[in-house]
Swiss-Prot record:
Transmembrane portions of the chain: 33-53, 213-233, 235-255, 284-304, 334-354, 384-404, 533-553, 562-582
Keyword Nucleotide-binding: no
Pfam families: Choline_transpo
Family affiliation: Belongs to the CTL (choline transporter-like) family.
Keyword Glycoprotein appears in the UniProt entry: yes
Membrane topology according to the record: Multi-pass membrane protein
Lineage: Eukaryota, Metazoa, Chordata, Craniata, Vertebrata
Single GO BP term: transmembrane transport
PANTHER family: CHOLINE TRANSPORTER-LIKE (SLC FAMILY 44), CHOLINE TRANSPORTER-LIKE PROTEIN 3
Listed name of the protein: Choline transporter-like protein 3
Subcellular location: Membrane
Top-level taxon in the UniProt lineage: Eukaryota
Cellular-component GO terms for this entry: membrane
Organism: Bos taurus (Bovine)
Length: 649
């Protein structure tokens, strides 16, 4: 690949024995082979997108279809060999089951004939005469399409071409516009087949779509809370930190209490009949246990680290001073989040198209079935890897851009005259020279996350069996991969900052950063960890308030929903939004301390080699060193006292 800018050897690479550690003016492209590999991978993704558009039929999934291959609410093309296909269903938007009270699933296929109708019968129809009257008055024909309403009561085999009597009253369901019977006996049987025996994807979509307004409102709430939290960290004081920690403690305890109360309410509800409601109850128990454990761990950590609050406030104020030199850094997550949303919507659309890609086959009675095309399962895995890798690449680009901005501002001698447009300068360096480095770092995260996903699937599969040893092994492996993921993310962030300084490739940058930080870790490790912990608590606060709103909202929508899945989706989205906004502080903090380590490595504070850090940052570091020295002295004195032998006078 040809670089988009001038290609020169860095001064740091001319002297391999000693790194110069200065922002380079002349750079070269790094990790170009990885960028080419990413380009080839995306060529495959574009092919899958084109294939899904050509072979998929998302309308069948979103709007529903009848037994003859017609999508309800659409104008359809005929299927060869199916005389009742290819009809105009523009006015017939509802899916009606002719035998809704006796549904069965045979070979992953409903036993009842399905039709598209213009409206669902809201009153019970006991005879064919009433079915005929309903068709004439409402224009909704409940018998097969080739039977005229006049013949409903005339031909002898009309009962085989019309719905089984009596036809129960029904209402349209939000997802697929299905006509759902309202009588208790039919409702239980219908729901147990339609929801409990349908595949997981449709059940999850059912819960999300039926509560889509609530999900959207909660996502907006999470967005607003994340903005508020970001500005809270921007103008943080000691009082705000104490209020913030108090809100965290109250929020955690409150959410735990509400979860246990809802679980108790479900266990004493005698009207629960559906498996989906029982799944909601199990999910509530799981949420309650997990939230209780997380609350206990966080409360212990808050108690242990309470003495570091004042230093943490000073640390965040130093971070805010670095951000004030380039205040548009706070808006960096907005465009990153917008790009992620666009990519996720595109990914879901392609996934839905892949899920509906199938060849129409005519079976007995002129009905139509859709058989999945070969190769779809491999495309699905490829598509999933594309989701993880591309999402990590977008987030890594933000990390590199923020780190480059911090580096530019930190290594500026004249603090009163900040550099012009540091964010645009950092972005231009990223896209011209270091995209390959970002691709390589995001690929390492992807390699770790895919086995985690597979192990989680294996663990969930083994939960229903008696393999206790297998479950334990898979869970331990998941924990190991989680720890590896966290370590890699921290290593990647420092590697991106080093690349922004020296212009070196990913492996060289990671090695240099690790070596430099290990030499200077005593200066800032503890306070940096607590700063990251406070930022993490900010994310937890956003999730707590959003989940509480979701619990109150979804608790009133128990009918025909797996509402535990939308609640989990809302919690994940809330954490993701909070992470997108607050990660700017984490990135600035990590980049700032790496620049500080570089400053200590290359300068000594003399007139010949003055520090790049300002006086406020230097005073903060001195206070940390004094506290660390005092703590070490106290520890040594306690050790010596314990080892002293008491002798008689």
């Amino acid at each position: 690949m040809q670089c988009l800018g001038a290609e020169h050897l860095d001064s740091a690479e001319r002297i391999p024995t000693q790194r110069q550690w200065r922002p380079q003016i002349y750079r070269k492209c790094t990790d170009t082979a990885w960028l080419f590999l990413f380009f080839l991978f995306w060529t495959g993704l574009v092919f899958i997108m084109g294939y899904s558009v050509a072979a998929g039929a998302t309308g069948r999934l979103l709007f529903g279809y009848d037994s003859f291959g017609n999508v309800c609410g659409k104008k359809n093309s005929p299927v060869e060999g199916a005389p009742l296909s290819g009809q105009d269903m523009t006015q017939k938007k509802h899916v009606f089951f002719m035998n809704s009270c006796n549904l069965e699933v045979k070979d992953v296929r409903l036993s009842s004939t399905v039709l598209c109708v213009s409206s669902c019968p809201e009153e019970q129809l006991d005879t064919l005469e009433e079915v005929q009257l309903f068709a004439n008055t409402s224009g909704s024909f409940l018998c097969v399409y080739n039977l005229n309403s006049f013949n409903y009561t005339q031909i002898p085999n009309a009962d085989l071409l019309c719905p089984r009597l009596p036809v129960p009253p029904s209402k349209s369901f939000p997802l697929f516009n299905r006509c759902i019977p309202q009588t208790p006996e039919c409702y239980s049987l219908f729901a147990s087949v339609l929801i409990n025996d349908v595949d997981s994807l449709h059940r999850i979509l059912s819960g999300i779509m039926s509560g889509r307004d609530t999900v959207l409102g909660l996502c907006i709430l999470a967005f607003a809370l994340s903005l508020a939290m970001m500005f809270t960290f921007r103008f943080i004081t000691t009082l705000l930190v104490h209020i913030f920690i108090a809100l965290i403690v109250l929020g955690l305890l409150f959410v735990c209490s509400v979860l246990w109360w809802l679980y108790y309410d479900y266990t004493n509800d005698l009207s629960i009949e559906l498996d989906t409601e029982r799944e909601n109850m199990k999910c509530l128990l799981g949420f309650a246990i997990v939230s209780t454990v997380i609350t206990a761990v966080l409360l212990i950590l808050i108690y242990v680290l309470r003495k570091r609050i004042k230093l943490t406030v000073e640390l965040l104020q130093v971070t805010n001073k670095a951000i004030s030199s380039s205040p548009f850094l706070l808006f960096q997550p907005l465009w990153t989040f917008a790009i992620l949303i666009f990519f996720w919507v595109l990914w879901v659309a392609v996934l839905l198209s892949l899920g509906t890609a199938g060849a129409a086959q005519v079976v007995e009675g002129g009905q139509v079935e859709y058989k999945p095309l070969s190769g779809i399962r491999y495309m699905w895995w490829y598509h999933l890897i594309g989701l993880i890798w591309t999402s990590e690449f977008i987030l890594a680009c933000q990390q590199m851009a923020v780190a480059g901005t911090v580096v530019t501002c930190y290594f500026n001698r004249n603090k009163s005259d900040p550099p012009d447009r540091p964010i645009l300068s950092s972005l231009s360096i990223l896209f011209c020279y270091h995209q390959g480095t970002v691709v390589k770092g995001s690929f390492l995260i992807t390699v770790v996350r895919i086995p985690r996903a597979v192990l989680m699937y294996v663990y969930n599969t083994l939960k229903e069996k008696d393999g206790a040893l297998s479950r334990c092994v898979s869970q331990c492996c998941c924990c190991c991969f989680w720890c590896l993921d966290k370590c890699l993310r921290h290593l990647n962030q420092n590697a991106y900052t080093t690349t922004a300084i020296n212009g070196t490739d990913f492996c060289t940058s990671a090695k240099d950063a690790l070596k430099l930080l290990s030499k200077n870790s005593s200066h800032f490790t503890s306070v940096n960890c607590f700063g990251d912990f406070i930022i993490f608590l900010g994310k937890v606060l956003v999730v707590c308030f959003t989940v509480f709103g979701g619990l109150m909202a979804f608790n009133y929508h128990r009918v025909l929903q797996v509402w535990a899945v939308p609640l989990l989706l809302v919690a994940f989205f809330a954490y993701l939004v909070a992470h997108s906004f607050l990660s700017v502080f984490e990135t600035v903090l990590d980049a700032l301390f790496l620049c500080f380590a570089v400053d200590l490595e290359t300068n000594d504070g003399s007139s010949e080699k003055p520090y790049f850090m300002d006086q406020e940052f230097l005073n903060f570091v001195k206070r940390i060193n004094k506290l660390n020295t005092r703590a070490q002295r106290n520890k040594n004195s306690l050790t010596s006292e314990e080892g002293t032998e008491l002798r008689p006078l």
